[in-house]
């Protein structure tokens, strides 16, 4: 996929870029693999806002993507590469030998007509899904499970991948895109290759309106609010924070304070943190 740049016909178009969608081969999604997606306006069941700066956006239909890849001992053919508005990566439409259709994340290099498989005996080939114990060291992988049978949870965004560094008993040592090194059960599955659409991070949205189409609302600084709205608010002119540390809107220390639960069960599987040197 390449990035196209618009002519500066207006202030909003100046420096605006977008995907050229050259890899997309089918514009309409598979109806049998769609589900309804309702907007919540970032409010919960009691009407309270649970996430700031989220609301609106274009109407979308959810694509049912297969993150588990448990249909073994059969071959699927890639029929199309499609756009998915719910994620940064593109998706590939598979048709199995028995006629079943499914979506998977489209890895880099996967093309229409390619054959993919899943299972312990699958080849080490882009798009194939195998248990981590069957994947050789040094291989780039994505869509990695954390619990057997739950489906892939790690390395699913556009352009991301992880690398197998080694094997230690019933665990496999994996280095993630962030630099974090962690242990993952060898029975968990992963897909070979990198997630495609890597240039997505280079897109310049150009104007606020495009972000509104994506469901993003304005992010207002606390320092320009009133003191009853934010701990940084108030004062005459451009006033400092006025506290020993920057604070969140709810009065908790932020900007450097670790928020991960020290007692979280999965901490023991992290060999090296993403910020470790």
Swiss-Prot record:
Family: Belongs to the universal ribosomal protein uL2 family.
Source species, domain of life: Bacteria
Organism name: Leuconostoc citreum (strain KM20)
Function, in words: One of the primary rRNA binding proteins. Required for association of the 30S and 50S subunits to form the 70S ribosome, for tRNA binding and peptide bond formation. It has been suggested to have peptidyltransferase activity; this is somewhat controversial. Makes several contacts with the 16S rRNA in the 70S ribosome.
Keyword rRNA-binding: yes
Name of protein: Large ribosomal subunit protein uL2
Gene: rplB
Subunit annotation: Part of the 50S ribosomal subunit. Forms a bridge to the 30S subunit in the 70S ribosome.
Gene Ontology terms for molecular function: rRNA binding; structural constituent of ribosome; transferase activity
Region spans: Disordered: 212-277
Basic residues: bias regions: 254-277
GO CC term (a single one): large ribosomal subunit
Keywords for the protein's UniProt record, in alphabetical order: Ribonucleoprotein, Ribosomal protein, RNA-binding, rRNA-binding
One Gene Ontology term from the biological process aspect of the record: cytoplasmic translation
A Pfam family hit: Ribosomal_L2
């Amino acid at each position: 996929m390449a990035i196209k740049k618009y002519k500066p016909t207006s202030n909003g178009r100046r420096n605006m870029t977008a995907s050229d969608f050259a890899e997309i081969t089918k514009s309409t999604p598979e109806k049998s693999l769609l589900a309804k997606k309702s907007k919540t306006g970032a409010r919960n069941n009691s009407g309270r806002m649970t996430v700031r700066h989220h609301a609106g956006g274009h109407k979308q239909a959810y694509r049912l993507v297969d993150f588990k890849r448990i249909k073994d001992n059969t071959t699927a053919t890639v029929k199309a590469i499609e756009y998915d508005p719910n994620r940064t990566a593109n998706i590939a439409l598979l048709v199995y030998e028995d006629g079943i259709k499914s979506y998977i994340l489209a890895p880099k290099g996967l093309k229409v007509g390619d054959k993919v498989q899943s299972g312990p005996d699958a080849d080490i080939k882009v798009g194939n899904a195998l248990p981590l114990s069957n994947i050789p060291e040094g291989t780039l992988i994505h869509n990695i499970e954390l619990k057997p049978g739950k489906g892939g949870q790690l390395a699913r965004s556009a352009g991301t991948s992880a690398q197998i560094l080694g094997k230690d008993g019933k665990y496999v040592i994996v280095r993630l895109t962030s630099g974090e090194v962690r242990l993952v059960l060898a029975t968990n599955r992963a897909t070979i290759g990198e997630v495609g659409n890597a240039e997505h991070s280079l897109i310049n949205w150009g104007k606020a309106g495009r972000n509104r189409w994506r469901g993003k609302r304005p992010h207002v600084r606390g320092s320009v609010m009133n003191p009853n709205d934010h701990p940084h608010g108030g004062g005459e002119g451009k006033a400092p924070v006025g506290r020993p540390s920057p604070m969140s809107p709810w009065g908790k220390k932020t900007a450097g304070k670790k928020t991960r639960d020290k007692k979280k069960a999965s901490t023991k599987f992290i060999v090296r943190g993403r910020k470790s040197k």
